[in-house]
Amino acid sequence: MSTKTLALIFSALWSACLYAAPVETLTQTCAQCHGETGVSTKAKIPHLNGQLSDYLEEDIRRIANGTRASTVPDHIPKSWTGEEVMAVADFYAASLGPRPAQTTDAAQVTRGAVWYKKRCADCHPDSGRESKRDAPLMAAQNLEYMKEQTRAFVSGKRKFVFLMDDAFKGLSAADLDGVAHYFASQEQFKK
């Protein structure tokens, strides 16, 4: 490799290091709703802590470019570089602070457990603590957020993979609420 090529590579790397914002700065906007460590302070806002980095990275990119619906579509800066998006996703994935316990309805949890086993467990195993097929982790996610998102999937406002359409097919609003109660009632991590 020539000296000129090495100099260009070094210069590009140095510039990237010099201009990449620290993750704490990048997450300041996120923290207003998702909390400093990704534990949301608002019922209809998802927890980000402990979520899969790849899932978060893809979601951030989709919200920023407008291909994923969001209640606050302009909250992710379009100027973030790929490295900055990865840094934010990695930051929240590594944040393992506990999510607060939620009030759930026992009858709804029982109803949701039945549907979870039939329709959700293949992609969200271990009661939503694990993932297959690029699915997000669901255990201990905000109840109101999950209820809102299931309605968005059913109405077509939000799209995921075809598997979600199959999973929701034929379920009533009460069944979907039951699944949300089931996931919300779970511990995020096994003890």
What function would you assign to each model-found segment?
Residues 19-39, 100, 104-127:
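Sequence/structural segment immediately N-terminal to covalent heme-attachment motifs in c-type
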Residues 1-7:
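Bacterial N-terminal signal peptides that target proteins for export
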Residues 15-17:
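N-terminal signal peptide c-region/cleavage motif recognized by signal peptidases
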Residues 26-29, 37, 44, 52, ...:
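Short pre-active-site segment immediately N-terminal to redox-active cysteine/selenocysteine motifs
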Residues 48, 86-104, 121, 125-141:
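His/Cys-centered metal/cofactor-coordination and adjacent catalytic loops
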Residues 38-69, 74-77, 113, 125, ...:
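Gly/Gly-Pro-rich "capping" loops immediately C-terminal to redox-active cysteine motifs
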Residues 78-100, 144, 167-191:
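C-terminal capping alpha-helices of c-type cytochrome domains
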